[in-house]
Amino acid sequence: MAAAKRSRAALTIYNVASRAGVSIASVSRVLNGQGTPRADTRERVMRAVEELGFVPDGAARALSNNVKEVVGVVFRRGAETPFADEDESLLFIDVINRGIEVAAQRRGFDVLISSVGVHDESVFTRVAAIAGKVDGLILHDRMLSPAEITRLASVVPIASLAGTPTRASMSVGCDNETGIRELVRHLVIDHGYRSLGYLAGHADSPDNRARASAFEAEASAAGAEIHMGAAWQGNYSASGGAEVITSLLDSGARLPRAIVCANDQTALGVMHALARRRVAVPGQVAVTGFDDVPVARHLHPPLTTVRQPIQKMGATAFEVLYSRISAGSRTRSVVLPVELIIRESCGCAHQPEALPNSTLAATGRA
């Protein structure tokens, strides 16, 4: 194993160029995403990178004992949509990144944030290039295979958020199962809803799979009619949620009495689409989310959801990564608790907050 690592550490961009039969400049353009190299050139470079197990800049950094005091954060960027101005990076991911940044600053670290496109063909190469510039990586969602994570983890420590757990990396997440089960029980037991739908997130997301599995198990145990599957496949975005509902209504499908969305952004799109078709929420269809992003409480009606400690997740991801960088800690996974947040979109009555006497006096209502 040590010999294999030394062999990999000796690799340079020159080896890739030689293996691919292209110039060093061409390899640099492909690896750095610069210019528009020809498709065959890109393919040859990527094949050489794969065959050699090359990690850009990483080996030289791994051989050095110098800590750069920089961690890299990579998230998956959604495709352009009609809701482009509310890309998920502005909601859930932004809050997580804020937690990472605050925790990093306390330790004297800087944060290098980057994104990869959902349909990018060179995700590993892009992430590997970032790995060569930092002391550790935090990856949002599932963007690399277990084999790719293992390869990168030989160069820098890796913590994944809602990603694929591997023996080579650390993971930080929330208790998806408990959150969804409590939500389903609330809808079935407290409201008496007998038909429930699950509008999914990314099909390859471990979080989505955990939530879908918990939903199906709890709804089945309650004897509820279940709506899920291909027709209910979203992508964690408002546009994805809106498109699913619009498609179902256009096809003449009967909507369930309550729709459990994989995240709050999906719920935002669902509520938007239902409002456009004059379907009352929660009077005709109840809608719930997952995350409790800041905007959730300001929707109309306010969104019932499962709150996960989003900013704490980011801070925790940095701390487990920092512990590995600074002290070689072997923490493998951290699961944070969640909380059911009941508002009005599920059908619960609005509970007005009591105003302090000083406020009542100022409004003439005391």
What are these regions (language model features)?
Residues 74, 138-140, 260:
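Structural motif
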Residues 80, 145-146, 267-268:
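Short glycine-rich, flexible loops that bind phosphorylated cofactors or substrates
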Residues 51-57, 118-122, 140-141, 243, ...:
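Short gly/ser/thr-rich secondary-structure transition/capping motifs
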Residues 1-70, 350, 359-366:
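N-terminal helix-turn-helix DNA-binding module of bacterial transcription factors
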